[in-house]
Amino acid sequence: MYGDRYIDWDGAHVRTLFAPVTVYTRPGCKPCERVKDKLTAAGIDFDAVDVTANSEAYDYVTKVLNAMSVPVVVTDTHKPILGYQPDQLDELIDYYTASETGL
């Protein structure tokens, strides 16, 4: 269980229904925790995927996105955010919070 909003799914994923954001992460990653904390504080639902426990996720992050480290934040609406990028995260949060309020 990650907070009270997430369902632990097979130890490698933390999933919600219809989450608009996926955060690729690994255990012990402080920047990953900051990303997840920032999204949680903003009320943004997300899936957290542990790349050390999911080889398909690892391949996607390293081979498709060409990311060398995590966190990696992926959505259907924005280009991937590689690493902890507070300004890009704020833009993403603004987009999703505005779309939820209809603005």
From Swiss-Prot:
CDD domains (alphabetical): NrdH
MF annotations from Gene Ontology: electron transfer activity
Domain Glutaredoxin, residue spans: 9-103
InterPro entries per UniProt: GlrX_YruB, Glutaredoxin, Grx-like_ET, Thioredoxin-like_sf
Disulphide connectivity of cysteines: none
Gene3D superfamilies: Glutaredoxin (3.40.30.10)
Source organism superkingdom: Viruses
PANTHER family with a match to the protein in the record: GLUTAREDOXIN, GLUTAREDOXIN-LIKE PROTEIN NRDH
Name this polypeptide is given: Gene 56 protein
Organism: Mycobacterium phage L5
Classification lineage: Viruses, Duplodnaviria, Heunggongvirae, Uroviricota, Caudoviricetes
Gene transcribed to yield this protein: 56
